[in-house]
Curated annotation (Swiss-Prot):
It comes from the Bacteria. UMP binds at residues 53, 74, 135-142. PANTHER family: URIDYLATE KINASE (PTHR42833), URIDYLATE KINASE PUMPKIN, CHLOROPLASTIC (PTHR42833:SF4). It catalyses: UMP + ATP = UDP + ADP. This is Uridylate kinase. ATP binds at residues 11-14, 54, 58, 162, 169, 172. One of its GO terms (biological process) is 'de novo' CTP biosynthetic process. Inhibited by UTP. InterPro entries: AceGlu_kinase-like_sf, Asp/Glu/Uridylate_kinase, Uridylate_kinase, Uridylate_kinase_bac. It is found in: Cytoplasm. GO terms for molecular function: ATP binding; UMP kinase activity. Keywords: ATP-binding, Cytoplasm, Kinase, Nucleotide-binding, Pyrimidine biosynthesis, Transferase.
Length: 240
């Protein structure tokens, strides 16, 4: 990528805040995220963050288990992202990092209602923008919500941090030892092949706005590396 990056949007999974030992929001992992967001902000890059809620509840996965309907399950998942967002916002403020916590659902006692205008203003003021509750509608994932925010805010790149893989593969590398990783793949090829890791709808949205996506491992790499090191993860873009 030759274009200078000045505004990024990170999609961070809720799992990145939790541990295998059962801590839904782990102090060490939260501290790491705050430290890395500070590093990105200190590089004079406007920083937005969309966070998932899988460490607390996975709406679709737990729908049958909890015997609730799909809409309610998805709405519960949205609220889980708000809980994570509140934790991140308070941790940022405790470290003297200005931020704006937003929600696509109206929760005035907890977060500002998301609007592109208010979010643009926060970014231009150097605040870390935290976007919660996904796209604000059931049946749409936080990946799609992240793509929508990236398009609305005209982000230079969408960076998806994953906990299980280090990029896009031709098949699931956790199941197939011969899976081949792509260093770079076009939007159209990704959609045509129906590859995993990123929702096809999210990729299609970014394709329409020509916003590149980098999928990378948050276990192996930092947020800052994902911006500046073109050799990590997989870049999904207009040409391969």
């Amino acid at each position: 990528m030759s274009k200078r990056i000045t505004r990024v949007l990170f999609k961070i999974s809720g799992e990145s805040l939790s541990t295998d030992s059962g801590n839904r929001i782990d102090e060490v992992r939260l501290s790491r995220l705050v430290s890395e967001l500070r590093a990105v902000r200190n590089s004079d890059i406007e920083t937005a963050l969309v966070i998932g809620g899988g460490n607390i509840l996975r709406g679709l996965a737990q729908q049958k288990e909890l015997q609730i309907n799909r809409v309610s399950a998805d709405q519960m998942g949205m609220l889980a992202t708000l809980i994570n967002g509140m934790a991140v916002a308070d941790a940022l403020k405790a470290d003297d990092i200005p931020c704006l916590l937003t929600s696509t659902l109206s929760c005035p006692q907890l977060a500002d209602l998301y609007t592109p205008q208010k979010s643009e203003e926060a970014l231009s003021q150097g605040k870390v923008l935290i976007c919660t509750t996904g796209a604000g509608s059931p049946y749409l994932t936080t990946d799609t919500g992240a793509a929508l925010r990236a398009c609305e805010l005209k982000a230079d790149i969408l960076l998806k941090a994953t906990m299980h893989v280090d990029g896009v593969y031709d098949k699931d590398p956790l199941m197939f030892t011969d899976a081949v990783k792509y260093d770079r793949i076009s939007y159209k090829d990704f959609v045509a092949q129906g590859l995993g890791v990123m929702d096809v709808s999210a990729v299609s949205l970014c394709m329409d706005s020509n916003i590149p996506i980098r999928v990378f491992s948050f276990v192996k790499h930092s947020l800052e590396q994902a911006i500046f090191d073109e050799n990590i993860g997989t870049l999904i873009c207009g040409d391969a």
